[in-house]
């Protein structure tokens, strides 16, 4: 009987362990992701440059999606979307040693690195030659028979006939891409090599999760298989299509991967532009945010929604390659995204341009306890003003965006904590917390910080210190809405003072580094 009970509990533990890795993206996840690169961002996205930013990201950014880190066959700088080597991790963004150092620094700061996994296709030397790579005593080499029979619209088959080479007997399972050889994911050799590659990325290099590129090119069932083989906790696929197709792909992975919420992005673009399909009207139409055409709105799929408002395939590149960027209201777009369920992914150029504002939005999101599965209610949907209330597991957060944010005023149960160009945040007073509108970080000069008492007690005051000690009833005292001067590097601690008791303390670490002129 004792033996049977041990077997039973062992099986239960095993099933629980398997199930833990079967969701593709954690339930009730409160993290925020940063896309750590943009197109041709070879300077800003060097591993050494990103490593220096890890301390500043701590507490705000939980995951950083890195550019494809494997070595390519080209000798010039490339973004990595035509992969050649899998086990050689020296790229246009730095050496393998620098990559390992970056990922270790991220982990020390509570940040996970997401690998850009490009396995729909692979580059070759000539038409058919893949590299032979040896890792842990095993040599891995793909063959011409690992290339889809109808690759490159049949051009590869014609060349194979000319060269006397045999391709796979299987056609491509999805969309063809003529930039490289499309891999046959039904091939046992392809599956073996990709699984070894992904285990190498996770277990050796130290990546926390995977972003799968161009998953329209092969069946989602293979993503499920690869994730099962590696036991990865975070997986997101780039299925660039309409909402029904994205949901269908998630289902094909057996919900073992999240997906980028492209329709959420298009909702935001159309609201900002005031028109659909990338056109720009005279005025924005914020009511377009009131859409059910996205993953984020669906309670059955918002866990798997990675929301974004712009990425490297949409950003403005040049006059000859303008693509489909946000034309305006970048801050308001991000304010909306960061107040909503799903896992928000901030674009690196936005982070660089508006880091202070985005940090405050993230702080508000986390203070309210908003997760990828939180529920929300629309409060107003007008052309010039849109408001949603999201219920976190700690408090409620109302986001108001539009050309006339004053058109919506919440009840007295809310306190305004943030205001910027075409956006406002209101936090429910049930949060019972102090708030400062300037987030932790490094600044080039002193500044004024506004303190707010978010409390149901109308008599609540604020007490604060700037020496890192916990504030008491005898500390400096101000009323809600007051501003204080921060002129030097310090640790601000501010709390609510109610009936002689101090609660809801928030901590802000400020480094003031005056700009030092230099000769060019």
Model features per residue range: what roles?
Residues 95-131, 135:
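Substrate-binding cleft of carbohydrate-active enzyme catalytic domains
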Residues 185-197:
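Alpha-helical scaffold elements lining the catalytic groove of polysaccharide deacetylases
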Residues 10, 20-21:
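Cleavable N-terminal signal peptides
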Residues 1-7:
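Positively charged n-region of N-terminal signal peptides that target proteins for export
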Residues 23-39, 49-58, 68-70, 74-82, ...:
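Active-site-proximal helices and loops of the catalytic beta/alpha 8
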Residues 29-31, 72-104, 134-184:
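Aromatic- and acidic-residue-enriched carbohydrate-binding clefts of CAZyme catalytic domains
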Residues 429-520:
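Short, compositionally stereotyped local motifs that mark structural "simplifiers"
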